Amino acid sequence: MSCTAKSAPDFLKKSVIYQIFLRPFTPGGTLQSAFRMLPYLSELGADILYLCPPMVADDDVRLEFWSDRQKKCALNNPMNPYRLKDYYNVDPEYGTNEDLKKFVAGAHELGMRVILDLVYYHCGPTPVFLKEHPDFVVRDAEGRVKNG
């Protein structure tokens, strides 16, 4: 069996993609402050805004669940946007679900598309979905969530 990748659509081949990690993007680091930057991003020629995960990050402080980069960083901050706790709600650090809807609508009004980066392959150690689906993670013999 051979696999062939689909060709990218023409609009994508011609697009300018601008990646936004909210925390350092503006002094406020919020969706509201990023919303105010939309006209500027449009003037830059961005067609697609690639938004790093704005959803609720896991705040579990157990170091065994931190990435190597988090452990080496002097900030001692468990919050990592790629270690999510809640895939359905915006992290209060960045704003609200309504702020996200407003950001996307504002981008669309200016003719820009939005890619929302969400990683489903891994999450933090205390995701809200575990209450409903405890079998969604690998556990050790004692029933603790395994890392890695």
Spans of model-derived segments:
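Substrate-binding/active-site clefts of carbohydrate-active enzymes
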Residues: 3-16, 22-32, 39-47, 54-148
